[in-house]
Protein backbone atom coordinates (compact mmCIF):
# COMPACT_ATOMS: atom_id res chain seq x y z
CA UNK A 1 0.00 0.00 0.00
CA UNK A 2 1.20 3.46 -0.91
CA UNK A 3 -0.36 6.58 0.54
CA UNK A 4 0.24 10.30 0.36
CA UNK A 5 -1.22 13.40 2.00
CA UNK A 6 -2.86 15.91 -0.31
CA UNK A 7 -4.19 18.81 1.75
CA UNK A 8 -4.57 19.63 5.45
CA UNK A 9 -3.85 22.35 8.01
CA UNK A 10 -0.17 21.44 8.32
CA UNK A 11 -0.01 22.00 4.56
CA UNK A 12 -1.70 25.39 4.83
CA UNK A 13 -5.40 24.70 4.14
CA UNK A 14 -8.50 23.21 5.69
CA UNK A 15 -8.77 19.67 4.35
CA UNK A 16 -8.12 16.04 5.17
CA UNK A 17 -7.70 14.89 1.58
CA UNK A 18 -5.58 11.73 1.49
CA UNK A 19 -4.66 9.36 -1.35
CA UNK A 20 -4.26 5.59 -0.96
CA UNK A 21 -3.17 3.16 -3.66
CA UNK A 22 -3.01 -0.62 -3.41
CA UNK A 23 -2.39 -3.28 -6.05
CA UNK A 24 -6.13 -3.33 -6.68
CA UNK A 25 -7.66 0.10 -6.16
CA UNK A 26 -6.86 3.82 -5.91
CA UNK A 27 -8.84 5.83 -3.37
CA UNK A 28 -9.02 9.59 -2.91
CA UNK A 29 -10.40 10.32 0.54
CA UNK A 30 -12.47 13.49 0.98
CA UNK A 31 -11.47 15.43 -2.12
CA UNK A 32 -12.04 18.91 -0.76
CA UNK A 33 -10.18 22.03 0.30
CA UNK A 34 -11.38 25.25 1.89
CA UNK A 35 -10.23 28.25 3.90
CA UNK A 36 -11.77 29.78 7.01
CA UNK A 37 -13.66 32.90 5.84
CA UNK A 38 -12.71 34.60 9.11
CA UNK A 39 -10.04 33.79 11.68
CA UNK A 40 -8.86 36.37 14.20
CA UNK A 41 -11.26 38.74 12.45
CA UNK A 42 -9.34 38.44 9.18
CA UNK A 43 -10.15 36.80 5.83
CA UNK A 44 -7.65 34.42 4.21
CA UNK A 45 -4.26 35.90 3.42
CA UNK A 46 -3.12 35.74 -0.24
CA UNK A 47 -0.66 33.02 0.79
CA UNK A 48 -3.61 30.87 1.88
CA UNK A 49 -5.46 31.48 -1.36
CA UNK A 50 -2.38 30.49 -3.32
CA UNK A 51 -2.03 27.30 -1.28
CA UNK A 52 -5.69 26.39 -1.75
CA UNK A 53 -5.23 26.63 -5.52
CA UNK A 54 -2.16 24.39 -5.33
CA UNK A 55 -4.00 21.78 -3.27
CA UNK A 56 -6.94 21.91 -5.66
CA UNK A 57 -4.59 21.24 -8.57
CA UNK A 58 -3.20 18.21 -6.75
CA UNK A 59 -6.71 16.95 -6.02
CA UNK A 60 -7.55 17.18 -9.71
CA UNK A 61 -4.35 15.35 -10.65
CA UNK A 62 -4.98 12.48 -8.25
CA UNK A 63 -8.70 12.31 -9.03
CA UNK A 64 -7.82 11.50 -12.61
CA UNK A 65 -6.12 8.32 -11.38
CA UNK A 66 -8.59 7.41 -8.62
CA UNK A 67 -11.16 4.63 -8.88
CA UNK A 68 -12.98 5.59 -5.68
CA UNK A 69 -13.60 8.98 -4.06
CA UNK A 70 -15.11 9.39 -0.60
CA UNK A 71 -17.33 12.04 0.99
CA UNK A 72 -17.26 11.43 4.74
CA UNK A 73 -19.68 14.33 5.36
CA UNK A 74 -20.73 17.59 3.77
CA UNK A 75 -18.56 20.27 5.33
CA UNK A 76 -16.90 22.40 2.68
CA UNK A 77 -13.39 21.09 3.26
CA UNK A 78 -14.41 17.48 2.54
CA UNK A 79 -15.97 17.58 -0.93
CA UNK A 80 -15.70 19.39 -4.26
CA UNK A 81 -18.74 21.61 -4.89
CA UNK A 82 -20.81 22.11 -8.01
CA UNK A 83 -20.61 25.91 -7.68
CA UNK A 84 -17.69 28.36 -7.94
CA UNK A 85 -15.87 29.30 -4.76
CA UNK A 86 -12.69 31.29 -4.26
CA UNK A 87 -12.10 29.78 -0.83
CA UNK A 88 -12.62 26.24 -2.15
CA UNK A 89 -10.49 27.02 -5.22
CA UNK A 90 -13.01 25.73 -7.72
CA UNK A 91 -14.71 27.17 -10.78
CA UNK A 92 -17.99 25.27 -10.49
CA UNK A 93 -17.01 22.69 -13.13
CA UNK A 94 -14.13 20.91 -11.40
CA UNK A 95 -16.48 18.51 -9.60
CA UNK A 96 -16.94 16.71 -12.92
CA UNK A 97 -13.20 16.00 -13.05
CA UNK A 98 -13.16 14.82 -9.45
CA UNK A 99 -16.26 12.60 -9.46
CA UNK A 100 -17.07 11.87 -13.09
CA UNK A 101 -17.06 8.13 -13.79
CA UNK A 102 -15.93 7.29 -10.23
CA UNK A 103 -17.49 5.19 -7.52
CA UNK A 104 -18.28 7.73 -4.81
CA UNK A 105 -18.69 6.38 -1.29
CA UNK A 106 -20.63 9.03 0.54
CA UNK A 107 -22.38 9.68 3.82
CA UNK A 108 -26.13 9.11 3.72
CA UNK A 109 -28.38 12.10 4.51
CA UNK A 110 -29.31 10.63 7.89
CA UNK A 111 -27.80 12.26 11.01
CA UNK A 112 -27.04 15.52 9.19
CA UNK A 113 -27.97 19.07 10.12
CA UNK A 114 -29.97 21.25 7.76
CA UNK A 115 -27.01 22.86 5.97
CA UNK A 116 -25.37 19.50 5.32
CA UNK A 117 -28.63 17.97 4.07
CA UNK A 118 -28.90 20.88 1.66
CA UNK A 119 -25.37 20.25 0.39
CA UNK A 120 -26.05 16.52 0.18
CA UNK A 121 -29.00 17.26 -2.09
CA UNK A 122 -26.93 19.54 -4.33
CA UNK A 123 -23.98 17.18 -4.51
CA UNK A 124 -26.19 14.15 -5.22
CA UNK A 125 -27.67 15.97 -8.20
CA UNK A 126 -24.18 16.98 -9.37
CA UNK A 127 -22.92 13.40 -9.08
CA UNK A 128 -25.74 12.17 -11.32
CA UNK A 129 -24.89 14.85 -13.88
CA UNK A 130 -21.21 13.85 -13.72
CA UNK A 131 -21.96 10.18 -14.33
CA UNK A 132 -20.64 9.06 -10.95
CA UNK A 133 -21.74 5.87 -9.22
CA UNK A 134 -22.94 7.23 -5.88
CA UNK A 135 -23.14 4.72 -3.02
CA UNK A 136 -24.32 5.46 0.50
CA UNK A 137 -21.45 3.96 2.43
CA UNK A 138 -22.60 3.98 6.08
CA UNK A 139 -21.43 0.68 7.60
CA UNK A 140 -20.70 -0.88 4.19
CA UNK A 141 -17.89 -3.14 2.96
CA UNK A 142 -16.42 -3.63 -0.51
CA UNK A 143 -13.83 -5.91 -2.09
CA UNK A 144 -11.50 -4.74 -4.85
CA UNK A 145 -9.42 -7.79 -5.72
CA UNK A 146 -7.36 -8.49 -2.63
CA UNK A 147 -8.15 -5.11 -1.05
CA UNK A 148 -10.97 -4.67 1.42
CA UNK A 149 -12.58 -1.30 2.11
CA UNK A 150 -14.97 -0.78 5.01
CA UNK A 151 -16.92 2.26 6.12
CA UNK A 152 -17.78 2.86 9.74
CA UNK A 153 -21.26 3.35 11.07
CA UNK A 154 -21.96 7.07 11.47
CA UNK A 155 -19.58 8.64 14.03
CA UNK A 156 -20.13 11.88 15.89
CA UNK A 157 -18.47 14.98 14.47
CA UNK A 158 -17.11 15.90 17.89
CA UNK A 159 -18.96 15.15 21.14
CA UNK A 160 -22.14 13.05 21.19
CA UNK A 161 -25.15 15.14 20.27
CA UNK A 162 -23.09 17.67 18.33
CA UNK A 163 -25.14 19.93 16.06
CA UNK A 164 -22.63 19.22 13.29
CA UNK A 165 -24.00 15.69 13.04
CA UNK A 166 -22.10 12.58 12.06
CA UNK A 167 -19.33 11.50 9.71
CA UNK A 168 -17.96 8.28 8.24
CA UNK A 169 -14.58 6.70 8.88
CA UNK A 170 -12.96 4.22 6.51
CA UNK A 171 -10.60 1.26 6.76
CA UNK A 172 -8.48 -0.12 3.91
CA UNK A 173 -6.64 -3.45 4.08
CA UNK A 174 -4.51 -4.95 1.31
CA UNK A 175 -3.24 -7.95 3.27
CA UNK A 176 -0.10 -6.13 4.37
CA UNK A 177 -0.98 -2.63 5.55
CA UNK A 178 -4.24 -1.71 7.27
CA UNK A 179 -5.05 2.00 7.18
CA UNK A 180 -7.85 3.67 9.15
CA UNK A 181 -9.07 7.14 8.15
CA UNK A 182 -11.06 8.98 10.85
CA UNK A 183 -11.96 12.48 9.64
CA UNK A 184 -13.48 15.13 11.89
CA UNK A 185 -14.03 12.96 14.97
CA UNK A 186 -12.43 15.89 16.82
CA UNK A 187 -10.34 13.88 19.21
CA UNK A 188 -11.76 11.36 19.06
CA UNK A 189 -14.10 12.50 21.81
CA UNK A 190 -16.33 9.41 21.77
CA UNK A 191 -15.53 5.67 21.97
CA UNK A 192 -17.05 4.60 18.65
CA UNK A 193 -14.14 5.73 16.43
CA UNK A 194 -11.75 3.81 18.69
CA UNK A 195 -13.91 0.69 18.43
CA UNK A 196 -13.97 0.96 14.64
CA UNK A 197 -10.18 1.35 14.53
CA UNK A 198 -9.67 -1.54 16.94
CA UNK A 199 -11.72 -3.83 14.70
CA UNK A 200 -9.49 -2.95 11.74
CA UNK A 201 -6.22 -3.74 13.61
CA UNK A 202 -4.56 -0.73 11.95
CA UNK A 203 -0.95 -0.31 10.99
CA UNK A 204 -1.65 3.35 10.12
CA UNK A 205 -4.26 5.66 11.66
CA UNK A 206 -5.13 9.07 10.22
CA UNK A 207 -7.29 10.96 12.72
CA UNK A 208 -8.87 14.38 12.94
CA UNK A 209 -7.63 15.66 16.28
CA UNK A 210 -9.35 17.89 18.85
CA UNK A 211 -10.01 21.59 18.20
CA UNK A 212 -8.25 23.25 21.12
CA UNK A 213 -10.06 26.54 20.39
CA UNK A 214 -13.64 25.25 20.86
CA UNK A 215 -13.50 24.35 24.53
CA UNK A 216 -13.97 20.61 24.04
CA UNK A 217 -12.64 18.23 26.70
CA UNK A 218 -8.98 18.16 25.65
CA UNK A 219 -8.01 15.79 28.44
CA UNK A 220 -10.61 13.28 27.23
CA UNK A 221 -9.43 13.67 23.64
CA UNK A 222 -5.80 12.99 24.60
CA UNK A 223 -6.90 9.95 26.60
CA UNK A 224 -8.76 8.61 23.57
CA UNK A 225 -5.81 9.33 21.29
CA UNK A 226 -3.73 7.32 23.75
CA UNK A 227 -6.09 4.39 23.15
CA UNK A 228 -5.30 4.64 19.45
CA UNK A 229 -1.58 4.54 20.30
CA UNK A 230 -2.22 1.40 22.37
CA UNK A 231 -3.48 -0.31 19.21
CA UNK A 232 0.19 -0.16 18.18
CA UNK A 233 -0.02 1.15 14.62
CA UNK A 234 3.42 1.96 13.31
CA UNK A 235 2.17 5.47 12.43
CA UNK A 236 -0.46 7.77 13.96
CA UNK A 237 -1.17 10.82 11.82
CA UNK A 238 -2.65 13.75 13.77
CA UNK A 239 -4.58 16.15 11.59
CA UNK A 240 -7.08 18.87 10.92
CA UNK A 241 -8.73 20.82 13.79
CA UNK A 242 -5.83 20.21 16.17
CA UNK A 243 -3.41 21.90 13.79
CA UNK A 244 -5.35 25.15 13.79
CA UNK A 245 -3.37 25.95 16.94
CA UNK A 246 0.33 26.80 16.69
CA UNK A 247 0.85 25.31 20.16
CA UNK A 248 -0.81 22.01 19.35
CA UNK A 249 2.25 19.90 20.21
CA UNK A 250 2.48 21.31 23.72
CA UNK A 251 -1.23 20.69 24.30
CA UNK A 252 -0.97 16.96 23.49
CA UNK A 253 2.56 16.46 24.86
CA UNK A 254 1.66 13.36 26.94
CA UNK A 255 0.63 11.62 23.73
CA UNK A 256 4.09 12.05 22.21
CA UNK A 257 5.66 10.62 25.35
CA UNK A 258 3.40 7.55 25.28
CA UNK A 259 3.90 7.03 21.54
CA UNK A 260 7.67 7.08 21.96
CA UNK A 261 7.44 4.40 24.65
CA UNK A 262 5.20 2.25 22.44
CA UNK A 263 7.31 2.66 19.31
CA UNK A 264 4.57 4.54 17.45
CA UNK A 265 5.56 7.39 15.12
CA UNK A 266 3.34 10.45 15.54
CA UNK A 267 3.21 12.20 12.17
CA UNK A 268 1.43 15.04 10.40
CA UNK A 269 0.44 15.38 6.77
CA UNK A 270 3.42 17.70 6.35
CA UNK A 271 5.91 15.27 7.87
CA UNK A 272 4.56 12.44 5.71
CA UNK A 273 5.12 14.67 2.70
CA UNK A 274 8.64 15.53 3.85
CA UNK A 275 7.71 19.19 4.18
CA UNK A 276 7.84 21.69 7.06
CA UNK A 277 4.57 22.49 8.79
CA UNK A 278 2.94 25.64 7.46
CA UNK A 279 0.03 26.44 9.77
CA UNK A 280 -1.14 29.32 7.63
CA UNK A 281 -4.59 29.69 9.17
CA UNK A 282 -3.23 29.58 12.72
CA UNK A 283 -0.65 32.21 11.71
CA UNK A 284 -3.06 34.45 9.80
CA UNK A 285 -2.44 37.50 11.99
CA UNK A 286 1.30 37.06 11.62
CA UNK A 287 0.98 36.66 7.85
CA UNK A 288 -0.82 39.99 7.55
CA UNK A 289 1.82 41.61 9.77
CA UNK A 290 4.76 40.09 7.88
CA UNK A 291 3.27 40.37 4.38
CA UNK A 292 0.72 43.21 4.38
CA UNK A 293 -2.16 42.71 1.98
CA UNK A 294 -5.50 44.32 1.32
CA UNK A 295 -8.20 42.88 3.57
CA UNK A 296 -11.00 41.80 1.26
CA UNK A 297 -14.50 40.78 2.27
CA UNK A 298 -15.59 37.16 1.93
CA UNK A 299 -17.15 36.36 -1.40
CA UNK A 300 -20.83 35.51 -1.77
CA UNK A 301 -21.61 32.08 -0.38
CA UNK A 302 -18.34 31.82 1.51
CA UNK A 303 -19.36 30.71 4.98
CA UNK A 304 -17.94 28.65 7.82
CA UNK A 305 -18.39 24.89 7.21
Swiss-Prot record:
Disulfide bridges in this chain: none
Protein species of origin: Pyrobaculum neutrophilum (strain DSM 2338 / JCM 9278 / NBRC 100436 / V24Sta) (Thermoproteus neutrophilus)
SUPFAM superfamilies assigned: Metallo-hydrolase/oxidoreductase
Gene3D superfamilies listed in its UniProt record: Ribonuclease Z/Hydroxyacylglutathione hydrolase-like
Protein name from the UniProt record: UPF0282 protein Tneu_0934
A Pfam family annotated for this UniProt entry: Lactamase_B_3
InterPro entries recorded: RibonucZ/Hydroxyglut_hydro (IPR036866), UPF0173_UPF0282_UlaG_hydrolase (IPR050114), UPF0282_hydrls (IPR014426)
Family indicated by similarity: Belongs to the UPF0282 family.
Amino acid sequence: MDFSPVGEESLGVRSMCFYVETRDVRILFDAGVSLAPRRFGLPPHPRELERARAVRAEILRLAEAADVVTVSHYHRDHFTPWYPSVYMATDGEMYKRVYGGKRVLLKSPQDLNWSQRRRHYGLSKALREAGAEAVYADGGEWAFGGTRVAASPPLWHGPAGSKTGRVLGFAVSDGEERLVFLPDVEGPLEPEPIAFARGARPTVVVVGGPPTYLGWDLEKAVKNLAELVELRPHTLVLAHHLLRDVQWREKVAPLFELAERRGVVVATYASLAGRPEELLEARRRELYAEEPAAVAEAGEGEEED
